[in-house]
Structure formats: structure tokens, C-alpha cells
Amino acid sequence: MNKYEIIGIVGEGAYGVVYKAKCKETGDFGKLVRSFIFLVAIKKFKESDDDEIAKKTIMREVKMLRLLKYKNIVMLKEAFKRKGRLYLVFEYVEKNLLEVLEDNAVGIDPKRLRYFIYQIIKGVTFCHKNYVVHRDIKPENLLINPKDN
């Protein structure tokens, strides 16, 4: 955790908290240089040493994320354990599809919507080719970068 500076909380879920952070080593915000991302999302899991089911679920997620390297799937940068808790560091993506939909109360342009659907299908197809089923596809879990990817 020493190389990251927490900026704020992105969200909370059943297994833990997701933080927005910047990499201290770069001293920069949000610029992409040769696939190294300075802004990251850090998923901090609740203590799970007592809960065998939670541990198995978390380890399955880590294994799956290490396997799934694809442009339409958020990238896992690293995973580490500190003080009995697991941390997953992802590329940071600013918005999700739910936020995009809420920002466009009159609806999304059909061409843009087709582009979103096409990318979702590409990502899901890649998962299925790797024998992974998402099981929780919903607008807030579909991340959208500034280029609509």
C-alpha cells in the first residue's frame, strides 16, 4: 500500500471497499503512458481468514482476473496481502454504464448504444471462451472510459 495514495472511496460492497488512488511513484494523475496507469482502483477485502466460503470466492476472482487479459475487461494490475487483508489493484475507470445512462435522461444516441453493446458482447464472449461466466452483469458493473470503451 505504500506506493499508493488513497484519494477517496469509489464504492462499498459485501466483500469490502473500493478506493480511488494514485501511484506515488509517478506523481501524476490519470495519464496513460505505454500501458502503465497512474490512477488505480484498489479493492480492499474485509478480513476473510475465518470465512472459508469468502476466501474461496476471493481466490477464484483473483485467479479469473489474472487469466482474463483483454481490452474490454478491466485490468488487474497487482494483488497483495497486508495485515491479513487482500488488496486488488485495477486500472481506474472513471464511469460506469449506469452513470452514463443517468447523465443522458433523454436516452443515448443509438450509434453510441450499439457501440456499448458491441463491446459488452466482445468482453462476455472472451470470458466464455475462457470458461468464465460473469453472473453479475448490470449497468453499474460495466465500466466506461472517456473514449466510450
Protein language model regions, located:
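Catalytic-loop of the protein kinase fold
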Residues: 128-145
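Activation segment signature within eukaryotic-like protein kinase domains
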Residues: 116-117
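Conserved short submotifs of the Hanks-type protein kinase catalytic core
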Residues: 84-96
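Conserved N-lobe ATP-binding subsite of Hanks-type protein kinase domains
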Residues: 17
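Flexible N-lobe loop architecture of eukaryotic-like protein kinase catalytic domains
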Residues: 11-14, 69-72, 82-85
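AlphaC helix of the protein kinase catalytic domain
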Residues: 98-108
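Conserved N-lobe beta3->alphaC-helix segment of eukaryotic protein kinase catalytic domains
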Residues: 29-40, 44-69
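A short, aromatic-enriched beta-strand patch in the conserved N-lobe beta-sheet
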Residues: 78-79
